[in-house]
């Protein structure tokens, strides 16, 4: 074997072993959480818009659909999460209707349909999600009419959306998961939700965007994973006054999250939708860990738990 061929062989072997290790690392449990986007309205090139997936076996349940959701799902599928293959995306849960959580909605509905998803999409969200859906589908009517009735001969059912406007309580249940929606406070939004997912091997609570919430403490109560939004007090201290007022009314400070986590007692706390500004991720973790001794990580796009 020539030296050049040996180098090529070793390079391919490293790639193969890396892929194998990734697949093994995500195959031990039935349930995985995949952070598809951990961003905020700030245009951070390293963080896609807010979205995460609960994947049980090979079935995915997506929470929120910020910009980039389908491409992040496609990337995760190549890392061994087969339930996130784009043509398998057909269940979506929306926490609230802020644009950073919903600008990927058309992408979520239309792109998997082009990629031959079978059957309709089930969407669960707050009051107003039906109107948003109807406007978006009307805007893209020429697109999907050509795809369905033109040379592609697309499946019309793949473009069908069943919209469910939620009320607090159990909003979805199948053989793999039960989903409980609960109200949280996010500024003046009339309806902003968090979710609790109960699967055969895990209980997972997703805060959505919110301030400190006793309801999250009740819903977690020792849950396996709590995924919670947060802002850095260090970064916050240098924000203009109008933004300080805004953030305090819409989001959860690191101090309040540490207090909440001490009472909720999750086995793992995952920081998400991190507002850091000119501070650092390390400083944010220091703020949490100074008052909370449980296991905590700062989530990044495509992290798997």
Could you tell me what each predicted segment is?
Residues 21, 194, 201-203, 211-303:
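Cap/insert and terminal regions of metallo-dependent hydrolase folds
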Residues 15, 93, 206, 270:
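Conserved Rossmann-like nucleotide-binding pocket used by diverse enzymes
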């Amino acid at each position: 074997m020539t030296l050049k061929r040996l180098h090529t062989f070793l390079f391919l072997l490293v790639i193969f072993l890396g892929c194998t290790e990734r697949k093994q690392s995500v195959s031990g449990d039935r349930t995985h959480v995949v952070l598809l986007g951990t961003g905020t309205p700030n245009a951070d090139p390293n963080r896609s818009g807010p979205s995460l997936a609960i994947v049980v076996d090979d079935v995915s349940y997506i929470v929120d659909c910020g910009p980039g959701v389908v491409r992040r799902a496609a990337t995760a599928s190549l890392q061994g999460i087969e339930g996130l293959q784009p043509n398998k995306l057909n269940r979506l849960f929306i926490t609230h209707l802020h644009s950073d959580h919903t600008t990927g909605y058309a992408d979520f509905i239309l792109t998997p349909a082009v990629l031959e998803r079978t059957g309709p999409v089930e969407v669960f969200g707050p009051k107003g999600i039906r109107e948003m859906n109807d406007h978006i589908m009307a805007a893209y009517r020429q697109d999907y009419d050509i795809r369905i009735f033109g040379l592609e001969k697309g499946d019309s059912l793949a473009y069908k959306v069943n919209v469910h406007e939620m009320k607090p309580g159990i909003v979805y249940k199948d053989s793999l998961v039960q989903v409980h929606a609960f109200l949280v406070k996010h500024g003046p939004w009339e309806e902003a939700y968090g979710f609790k997912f109960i699967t055969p091997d895990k209980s997972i609570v997703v805060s959505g965007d919110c301030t400190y919430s006793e309801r999250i403490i009740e819903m977690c109560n020792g849950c396996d994973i709590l995924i919670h939004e947060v802002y850095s007090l260090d970064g916050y201290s240098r924000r203009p006054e109008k933004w300080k007022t805004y953030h305090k009314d819409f989001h959860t400070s690191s101090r309040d999250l540490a207090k909440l986590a001490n009472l909720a007692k999750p086995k793992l706390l995952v920081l998400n939708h991190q507002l850091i500004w000119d501070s650092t991720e390390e400083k944010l973790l220091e703020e949490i860990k100074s008052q909370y001794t449980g296991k905590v990580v700062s989530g990044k796009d495509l992290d798997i738990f």
